[in-house]
C-alpha cells in the first residue's frame, strides 16, 4: 500500500510539471527545446541568407529600388597590352580628325609612351551610318593612321579592316556633331559597340566615348537650329545625351570630354575663337586642346605637366589648352571658369619648344 501511494505521488508530480510547462510563454518553450545553432544566426532561416531579406532577392540591393546610375567619368587609365605601344582607334568623322590626327602622337611621345593612332574616317558620319556600313561591309572609309609620327591615309577601307588591323587597346565611338545632343539618335550605339567588341582581336579592348563640342556662337551650321542656335544650349544637350548614354551603355568605360575642354577654354581670354568655320576646331590651339584632353582622359596623367607644345601654339595658348583639358577630365560635364587666364599676355612666345611636332602634311 505504501509503494502504491509513492507511485501515485510521483504520477501527480509529473502531471503538475507538464502543466507548468504548458503554461510557459512561446519564446520560453522555443528556448528550452531548440537545438544548438551557430551563434549569430537566426534559427529557422537559411544560414546563407541575411535575416529579414526576401529569399531570392540579392541581399546587397534594396528591393523595389533601382540601382544607382554610374557616375560619368573618364576611363580608368589605359595601358599597352603589349607592354610597349599604346594602340588607339577612333571610329569617327572630321571631329575625331580634329582631335587625334595632329598633336596627340607628340603629346604621348613627350610623356615617354609610344603610340599607334588610327582614325576610321567618314565626314559627318553618324552612329547609324557607321553601323549600317559595318553590317553591309561598305568600303567607304578613309583609314588615317599615325605610326612613328608619320601619318598615312588609305582610302576605300571597310570598318572591319580597321578594327582588325591592330590589336587595339582602346577604340572610341562618337556621334556626328549635329546629332550629338539628341539622345534619341544614339539608339544603335550598343549595337555598334557589340560589333566592335565581337571583331576586336584584343578581347579586353577598352571602349570609350568621344564627347564632341558645341558650335561657335555665330555658327551657320545647318543643324545649329536644333539647339536654338545657342552654344550653351547645345553644350548642355550634349552633356545630357552623354550622361544618359553612359547610364545605358555599360560597355562604355568612360568619356573623353573634348566638348567640355573646348567650353572651358572659351572662358579664357581666347574667348569664342576655337572654331575655324563655326564648328571644326581652330587648327592650332583648338586642335591642341582636344589632343590634350585625349591624353589625360586615356592615361590619367595631368596634361599640365606635359612638356610638349606645338611650334604654332604660343606659351599662353598652350597653358590655356592644357588647363582646359585637365579641368574637363576632373569635371566631365561641367564648365570650369579658367580664372587664371582672363587677361591676354602682353607678349606671347611662339618660339620652337624643346619637343617639335612631326610633319603631318596637309590635313
Regions from the PLM with identified roles:
Residues 1-21:
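Sec-dependent bacterial lipoprotein signal peptides
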Residues 226-329:
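Catalytic His-Asp segment of secreted/periplasmic serine-dependent ester chemistry enzymes
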Residues 162-243, 249:
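Acidic/His-rich structured neighborhood in mature extracellular/periplasmic domains
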Residues 60-113, 117, 309-312, 321-361:
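N-terminal module-boundary/linker segments of secreted carbohydrate-active enzymes
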Residues 87-91, 116-121, 169-174, 206-211, ...:
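Structural recognition of the beta-strand scaffold that forms the well-ordered cores
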Residues 98-189:
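Conserved SGNH/GDSL esterase-like catalytic core that processes O-acyl groups on lipids
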Residues 15-77, 82:
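Bacterial Sec-dependent N-terminal signal peptides
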Residues 94, 98, 106-111, 174, ...:
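Structured segments of extracytoplasmic/periplasmic soluble domains
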Amino acid at each position: 500500500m505504501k509503494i502504491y501511494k509513492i507511485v501515485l505521488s510521483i504520477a501527480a508530480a509529473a502531471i503538475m510539471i507538464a502543466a507548468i510547462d504548458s503554461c510557459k510563454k512561446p519564446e520560453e518553450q522555443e528556448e528550452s527545446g531548440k537545438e544548438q545553432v551557430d551563434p549569430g544566426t537566426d534559427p529557422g532561416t537559411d544560414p546563407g541568407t541575411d535575416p529579414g531579406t526576401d529569399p531570392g532577392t540579392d541581399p546587397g540591393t534594396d528591393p523595389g529600388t533601382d540601382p544607382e546610375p554610374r557616375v560619368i567619368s573618364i576611363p580608368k587609365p589605359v595601358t599597352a597590352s603589349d607592354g610597349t605601344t599604346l594602340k588607339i582607334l577612333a571610329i569617327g568623322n572630321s571631329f575625331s580628325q580634329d582631335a587625334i590626327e595632329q598633336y596627340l602622337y607628340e603629346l604621348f611621345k613627350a610623356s615617354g609612351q609610344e603610340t599607334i593612332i588610327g582614325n576610321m574616317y567618314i565626314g559627318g558620319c553618324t552612329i547609324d551610318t557607321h553601323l549600317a556600313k559595318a553590317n553591309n561591309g561598305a568600303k567607304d572609309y578613309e583609314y588615317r593612321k599615325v605610326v612613328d609620327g608619320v601619318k598615312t591615309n588609305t582610302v576605300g577601307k571597310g570598318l572591319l579592316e580597321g578594327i582588325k588591323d591592330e590589336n587595339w587597346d582602346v577604340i572610341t565611338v562618337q556621334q556626328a556633331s549635329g546629332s550629338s545632343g539628341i539622345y534619341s539618335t544614339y539608339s544603335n550605339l550598343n549595337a555598334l559597340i557589340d560589333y566592335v567588341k565581337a571583331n576586336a582581336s584584343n578581347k579586353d579592348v577598352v571602349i570609350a566615348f568621344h564627347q564632341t563640342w558645341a558650335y561657335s556662337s555665330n555658327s551657320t551650321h545647318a543643324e545649329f537650329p536644333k539647339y536654338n542656335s545657342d552654344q550653351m544650349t547645345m553644350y548642355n544637350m550634349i552633356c545630357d545625351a552623354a550622361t544618359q548614354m553612359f547610364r545605358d551603355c555599360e560597355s562604355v568605360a568612360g568619356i573623353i570630354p573634348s566638348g567640355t575642354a573646348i567650353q572651358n577654354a572659351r572662358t579664357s581670354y581666347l574667348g569664342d575663337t576655337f572654331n575655324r568655320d563655326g564648328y571644326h576646331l581652330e587648327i592650332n590651339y583648338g586642335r591642341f586642346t582636344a589632343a590634350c584632353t585625349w591624353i589625360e582622359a586615356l592615361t590619367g596623367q595631368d596634361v599640365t605637366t606635359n612638356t610638349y607644345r606645338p611650334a604654332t601654339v604660343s606659351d599662353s595658348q598652350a597653358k590655356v589648352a592644357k588647363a582646359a583639358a585637365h579641368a574637363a577630365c576632373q569635371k566631365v560635364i561641367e564648365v570650369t571658369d579658367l580664372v587664371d587666364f582672363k587677361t591676354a599676355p602682353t607678349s606671347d612666345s611662339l618660339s620652337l619648344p624643346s619637343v617639335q611636332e612631326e610633319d603631318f602634311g596637309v590635313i
